[in-house]
Amino acid sequence: MSLQEEIIAQLGVKPIIDPEEEIRKSVDFLKAYLKKHPFLKSYVLGISGGQDSTLAGRLAQLAVEEMRAETGDNSYRFIAVRLPYGVQVDEDDAQKALAFIQADVSLTVNIKESADAMTKAVEATGAKVSDFNKGNIKARSRMIAQYALAGSYSGAVIGTDHAAENVTAFFTKFGDGGADILPLYRLNKRQGKQLLAALGADPALYEKVPTADLEEEKPGIADEVALGVTYNEIDDYLEGKSVSAQAQETIESWWHKGQHKRHFPITVFDEFWR
């Protein structure tokens, strides 16, 4: 079995999907988790205005609506939280995403003060916090806020990790990579677009250029620029298609480099890193 085949099998990616079937699978998955854990009454998710959080947010809202209808328990709810660092340049996109999601509760927690305070506290030791490192502090500050809200609302935190992001490990460890449940896992980027289209989303919500937008020295840098490979190439690879030698090498290099992000903290019994 080639490495490409191993990765596809591990991430569970299908070459062709039925969007309606995958929507139902994710909604049922989210409902099943709530049913298994009756002390949980909500889902919490940070909404950036990008494709992934827009899709995960709408799926979560559908899940809690069905839970209310099926159980008669109106305490189930979805909490969408905006987590800007100061003023977000594409705030209009985030508001359009919220309008599409129609969350039960929409909140805003501005992370600038907390992220800046942590950066300042660390630099007070004499350490230098790079722009890239501060970007990770921002991502982790956002997850702190989401878990604080989940604690207040008897909730679980939804993550937006999907196959195209997972294969490249394009997420912050214990930041956006830290969550309780991943309803998009198994889908690549173009398949996520198909689900949003099937849900009736405005194409503007999933056709915008994806960006993590964490670095102040490189504001709005596109994911594809940071990765050195396009999402179309990543998606083709994950669907078992042939890609250029350069694209394959880049994708597989990210896969190897990011292995530590896909595991809990390493123990003496772990072998993957040796």
Curated annotation (Swiss-Prot):
E.C. number: 6.3.1.5
Xref: CDD domains: NAD_synthase (cd00553)
GO cellular component: cytoplasm
Residues that coordinate or bind deamido-NAD(+): 140, 173, 180, 260-261
Listed Pfam families: NAD_synthase
Reactions it catalyzes: deamido-NAD(+) + NH4(+) + ATP = AMP + diphosphate + NAD(+) + H(+)
SUPFAM superfamilies in alphabetical order: Adenine nucleotide alpha hydrolases-like
Annotated metabolic or biological route of this protein: Cofactor biosynthesis; NAD(+) biosynthesis; NAD(+) from deamido-NAD(+) (ammonia route): step 1/1
Molecular function as annotated in GO: ATP binding; glutaminase activity; metal ion binding; NAD+ synthase (glutamine-hydrolyzing) activity; NAD+ synthase activity
Amino acids binding Mg(2+): 52, 165
GO biological process, any: NAD biosynthetic process
Amino-acid positions noted as binding ATP in the UniProt annotation, renumbered to this chain: 46-53, 160, 189, 211
Enzyme class: ligase
Role description: Catalyzes the ATP-dependent amidation of deamido-NAD to form NAD. Uses ammonia as a nitrogen source.
Subunit structure: Homodimer.
HAMAP family recorded: NadE_ammonia_dep
Family the UniProt entry places it in: Belongs to the NAD synthetase family.
Full protein name: NH(3)-dependent NAD(+) synthetase
Protein species of origin: Streptococcus sanguinis (strain SK36)
Primary gene name: nadE
